[in-house]
């Protein structure tokens, strides 16, 4: 827990969590599906308890599992991912890319990508991305922002974004100019 607390109260390049989160706010956590190793069960209890200390109630937090185009997680897999304590306290949702009614439209990017994001991320004050950062063969890196796209985006958004993988600027470890990053 020390390392987790150190990371959230002394982060690199952003304010500490107690300067961002205020009492009574609503928070959504994005967690990985079983295809990505993240050990969420290690840090989610710490994050949820710290949110409580900062004045965020359990009923004002929830978890969205970033599935992208992968299969839904079972209830058992969700509990295993975040631990029994957290699973018993927070609502948990699969982000199912083919369930269009689960997404909110935000417009179209300059590259023509329609932006549909999971509705459970839209009516909160903060979205906290969890997981690991790894090299990705066309998106530059996996994890981080990829928790939102493709993780919590509708199929149409994912399909158009992934169509850019053949762009010469797409590639392993590339971020500058990479249309998929």
PLM-predicted stretches and their roles:
Residues 12-28, 55-58:
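Glycine-rich phosphate/diphosphate-binding loops that line cofactor/substrate pockets in enzymes
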Residues 26-37, 62-68, 129:
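Short glycine-rich or small-residue beta-strand-to-loop segments that form or flank ligand, phosphate
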Residues 50, 137-159:
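A short, gly/pro- and small-residue-rich
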Residues 1-8:
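N-terminal amphipathic/basic leader segments beginning at the initiator methionine
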Residues 149-181:
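Extended, low-polarity segments enriched in aliphatic/aromatic residues
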Residues 37-56:
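Histidine-anchored nucleotide/phosphate-binding helix
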Residues 57-60, 88-89:
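Short acidic capping loops at alpha-helix termini that bridge into adjacent secondary structure
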Residues 73-142:
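An acidic, phosphate/nucleotide-engaging active-site surface
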């Amino acid at each position: 827990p020390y390392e987790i607390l150190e990371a959230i109260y002394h982060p690199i390049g952003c304010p500490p969590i107690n300067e961002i989160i205020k009492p009574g706010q609503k928070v959504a956590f994005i967690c990985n599906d079983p295809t990505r190793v993240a050990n969420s069960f290690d840090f989610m209890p710490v994050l949820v308890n710290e949110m409580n200390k900062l004045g965020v109630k359990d009923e004002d937090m929830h978890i969205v599992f970033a599935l992208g185009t992968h299969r839904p997680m079972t209830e058992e897999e969700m509990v295993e991912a975040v631990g029994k304590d957290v699973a018993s306290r927070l609502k948990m949702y699969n982000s199912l890319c083919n369930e269009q009614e689960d997404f909110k439209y935000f417009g179209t990017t300059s590259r023509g990508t329609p932006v549909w994001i999971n509705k459970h991320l839209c009516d909160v004050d903060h979205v906290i991305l969890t997981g690991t950062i790894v090299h990705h063969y066309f998106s530059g890196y996996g994890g981080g922002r990829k928790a939102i796209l493709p993780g919590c985006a509708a199929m149409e958004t994912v399909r158009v974004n992934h169509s850019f993988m053949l762009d010469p600027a797409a590639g392993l470890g590339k971020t500058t100019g990479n249309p998929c990053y």
